Structure formats: structure tokens, C-alpha cells
Amino acid sequence: MPSSLAILVSKCTIFPDQKSHVETLKLSVSDIPMLSCQYIQKGVLLTAPPFSFQDLVVFLQQSLSTTLSCFPPLAGRLITDPDGHVHIDCNGAGIDFLVVKSPTLSVNDILCPGDVPGCVKEFFTFDKTLSYSGHFKPLAAVQVTELADGVFIGCSVNHAVTDGTSFWHFFNTFAEITRGASKISKNPDFCRQTVFNSQAVLKFPTGGPTVTFSGDEPLRERIFHFSREAILKLKYRANYGCLLTKQTNSEIVGKLSNDNWKSVNSNTEISSFQSLCAQLWRSVTRARKLEPTKTTTFRMAVNCRHRLDPKLNPYYFGNAIQSIPNIAPASELLANDLSWGANLLHKSVMAHDNETVLGGVEDWERQPRLFPLGNADGASITMGSSPRFPMYNNDLGWGKPLAVRSGRANKFDGKISAFPGREEDGSVDLEVVLAPETMAGLENDAEIMQYVSQVELVN
């Protein structure tokens, strides 16, 4: 792979093209714990547009200005009132917009098999920036990088301001306006009269919180692609593993050919994604060579918008997530079949209803605290993002993205991010970050690698 030569061409501030109708938004019980998390960094790889890069930059700047008028909190700054409550001041201070050129990099350099190339981290700004820094830094930034034969658009957003659902809502709207839409199709909901609104105060030391993981340990990062067929096989194993030896692979896929992995038909059925997560939990635990009695943890984030009664607006803007830790001794997880671990995950997700969400809010109010991101005991996995997110809806006018990639933010041994496959047929890409020796073990784990397939390069 050629060396990455990133040249900063320009940097400016993009302001909303209209004055905000929203003045301030108070951070919620779900927002505040994220102040110690780094900015979300996600972006899309695109083919070169059918017009000049200079024209693209102008189009993006104009559409971003319009988009910010639809999402005024992102153009603001954080403020803390005398009582210690943190708010978003929707003051229209603007966001950063960077133009970068990397003429030696090609699209296939980014899509190459094996580890994610380090140059991808250069496609984002606000590297290692904690969300608390939104008190004095922009709450978002967009970086446009011109490659030899393509474009990468990287977006960095304060994690105390958005979760993944709101992040991709913003990105999709940005793409929609860039395509020429005169009116956006999905308006964000800035209502703060929800169960997450609280009078509890989390006190911060002078200068704000520190990151909850070291970030200095050696890591490897790789994208593992799971086709729709592989996902269906995993789901079948998790639900009907005892019957698996009696049927051929083609029969299994045929049996589940009408499966929609996004919608589980029964509360008793383990979903496709839960099946995939359970397989990853098993294989990473085996690759870590833990003591049999060591307690392993698989932490999942759940979207609470539809779990509340009454439900939140699907386009509620902000964080509306809670974390579910699932624990199991290493020996039990590995001694049992896939369905055992998958059933643990399934039961915890199904149990996370309105009452559980409210209980989580009350628990936080009794003991306000930051989100414990990291892997302190060496036996944890944290699953972030979601293959449900509409990442490939970011067509800016000349075709959907070739791939989705993320920056350096919030990565540590055991951090996994789930993306939809580009096929958008139920396939999944897992962005896996592990210690080098664990990654080597995972790559040699036949149980999971039988389901992994290569993504073809661009011709």
C-alpha cells in the first residue's frame, strides 16, 4: 500500500443558513454519561463524483449549512449552569469543515483485505477529543478527503449530543439535501420532556472528566464480512442447533429464505444479530485463552425509543440508549453450544422493556456516573453501532457509498462496531478491534471464520 500523504487544503467554519428556533437543550440522563466518551467518528467512502472536486466542496458547504438549520444543536456549544446541569446552547457558533487531499491513496487501498489501514484514521478530525470539550470546541465537524479515484466524507460528532440513531439521521439528511431535496423527509424531534430528563447532577473535576480507557495499547482492527447466507446459518444454529446435522446448508437457507433479520417474528426466537453476537462472544473468549473461571462480559447498547410506553419519536434527537451487560464464566460459554450464549443475549434484550428503562434512569439518578467505556479486566466485549442504521442511504447524488469506516475514537481491546453490509440484504460487517494476539487467535478460529467472506475490490 502506498504511503498516505494527507494535505490539509483548507479549514473553515460552516454556520446554519437560518437562525435557530431552539435556544437551549438540557442534556439528559442518557446524554451526560457520554461526556467522557470521545466524539463519534464515522464516514463513507464514495467513488469520484462526475464533476470537479472543487464543485463538490462548494455543494457540500452549502448543503451542510442548510442541514445545520434543521439540526441547530450541532451548531451550538455546551454550557454548564450554576446548578451544574449541562445544556446545549444552540447559538449558531458553527462547525468545522476541512478539505484534505490524499492523492496517493486509492479506493482499493481502503477496501484492501486484512487489517484496516492506518490512513483511515486521517479521514477524521477531533481525534481523541472528549465530548466534554464541547464546552469550548465545535460539537461537530465534517472532513472531505479527495483520493486518487474517490472521496471520503468523515463526520465527527459530540457523543453527548447524539447517539448512533441521531448521528445517522443527521448524516442521511445532509446527503438528502446534497442530492437536491428542497424539504427533508424526516424532521428531528428536540423534545426534552421525556423520562430521561432529570434534576440529578453529575459533578465534574476542574477541567472535566478523563477518558476511561488507556488508548495506548497495541491494537489490530479488521472488518469481518458476514453474508446474508452466513447470517441465516448462524441464526439457524442458535435456534435449532440440535437439528443442524440433519439438513444441508441449502435446506437451511431455503427454510429461512423469507427471514427478515431486522424483524423477529416471535419473542421466543433468537434474532440473526443476537446469533452473530453470541458467535463472536464465544470465538473472542476462546482466542483470549482465559482461565475457565474468568467472568466474561458482552455489553450491548439498546435503543430505548421504542421500548418506552409511550414510545419516543423515532427521530428523537439525542442519546436514548442504555447498556446491557451480559456475563458468563468462560468455561460455561465455551462448553455449551451457540444457542446457550445466544439465549442469554436474547433474554436480556427482550427483558429491556419500559419498566427496565425507567429502573435504569432511577439507578443513575441515585448514583450519577460516566459510561464505563473500556476493557479493564481483559475479558469484556463492547458492541457498538448497529446494522440497522441506514449507513448506505448516504447517496450524495452519484451512487451509494462503497463502504463505511470509522476513526480512532472510543477504540480499545474488545470494541466491536456493527455495520450493515453494502448489499443491504441482511449481511453484516463487523469492525473488530482486539489485542494483536487475540486477533491472531480469532483469525484461526474455525468456528467463526467459516462464516466470514471477502468483499470484492472495486474494478
Question: Where does each model-flagged region fall?
Answer:
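Soluble acyl-CoA-dependent acyltransferase catalytic core bearing the H(X)4D motif
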Residues: P2-T24, S36-M391
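Short, surface-exposed beta-strand/loop micro-motifs that present aromatic residues
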Residues: P33, L139-T145, D413-G421
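Low-complexity, glycine/alanine/valine/leucine- and proline-rich hydrophobic stretches
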Residues: A376-V458
